[in-house]
Amino acid sequence: MSVVANPLHPLFAAGVEDIDLREALGSTEVREIERLMDEKSVLVFRGQPLSQDQQIAFARNFGPLEGGFIKVNQRPSRFKYAELADISNVSLDGKVAQRDAREVVGNFANQLWHSDSSFQQPAARYSMLSAVVVPPSGGDTEFCDMRAAYDALPRDLQSELEGLRAEHYALNSRFLLGDTDYSEAQRNAMPPVNWPLVRTHAGSGRKFLFIGAHASHVEGLPVAEGRMLLAELLEHATQREFVYRHRWNVGDLVMWDNRCVLHRGRRYDISARRELRRATTLDDAVV
């Protein structure tokens, strides 16, 4: 069975039709989705009201699952699977959390451009985010194409970036927002790792920028110079021409490739309920 995909952006991202993710996928469908991911890097599946079991089963088609920030979070989950990340403003009692609650404050970092789990090696490959409850307005998610962004860099800057590496740290994005209320154990739960600023995508052979809010500095450069370089690259990569904005409906599942896509949530009224669940697969690359 072929998988039908319609473009959502001139450079990347596609909507997938005529497939029911609640049912077990055959090997042909899995391979076709992987092929589309190599080409489009973001796939949108509408009308997929998945249970936790169904979301986990779908995600496991694409490799082992990873927990990412769970090691730092060190708090109970509302979900039956530790591998499901709670992207919501809902507390353990099922009510919308208070504005200053950890569930809310911690998730503000999701509104910075980032790649899931770039703070570990191996990092994440695919993330699959399922919309359970969406607010009346706002709360969209944006994605930017880091392969196209690299291609559009001046050749001299491309050459300058070769061989440079950035340090990524799990709490860097939180610290940027003044969210520093973490114990020593939490701060040390995931030591920093470093990644090349430019990597090659295994599925397409294309080069891409690997940066984002987890990247704290560039190794071998003065801190200020390195941070300005990271800021310049991020400003370039997140121009409108490289960005797809997804407006959520209940039952949407969006799947993206963390290696060559950055994403961020957008602002919404945090007194309105917003519930999304994310499953993420582990990559096999250590560079």
Curated annotation (Swiss-Prot):
Activated by ascorbate. Hydroxylated on Trp-113; inactivates the enzyme. Changing H201A: Loss of activity. It is an enzyme of class 1 (oxidoreductase). Binds 1 Fe(2+) ion per subunit. The modification 3-hydroxytryptophan is found at W113. Its cofactor is Fe(2+). The keyword Iron applies. 2-oxoglutarate binds at T141, W248, R274, R278. It comes from the Bacteria. Changing H168A: Loss of activity. GO terms for biological process: 2,4-dichlorophenoxyacetic acid catabolic process. Pathway: Xenobiotic degradation; (2,4-dichlorophenoxy)acetate degradation. Changing D116A: Loss of activity. GO terms for molecular function: 2,4-dichlorophenoxyacetate alpha-ketoglutarate dioxygenase activity; L-ascorbic acid binding; metal ion binding. Keywords: Aromatic hydrocarbons catabolism, Dioxygenase, Hydroxylation, Iron, Metal-binding, Oxidoreductase, Plasmid, Vitamin C. Changing H214A: 10-fold decrease in affinity for 2,4-D and highly reduced activity. Changing H263A: Loss of activity. Its EC number is 1.14.11.-. Fe cation binds at H114, D116, H263. Belongs to the TfdA dioxygenase family. Involved in degradation of the herbicide 2,4-dichlorophenoxyacetic acid (2,4-D). Is also able to degrade 2-methyl-4-chlorophenoxyacetic acid and 3-chlorobenzoic acid. This is Alpha-ketoglutarate-dependent 2,4-dichlorophenoxyacetate dioxygenase. It comes from Cupriavidus pinatubonensis (strain JMP 134 / LMG 1197).
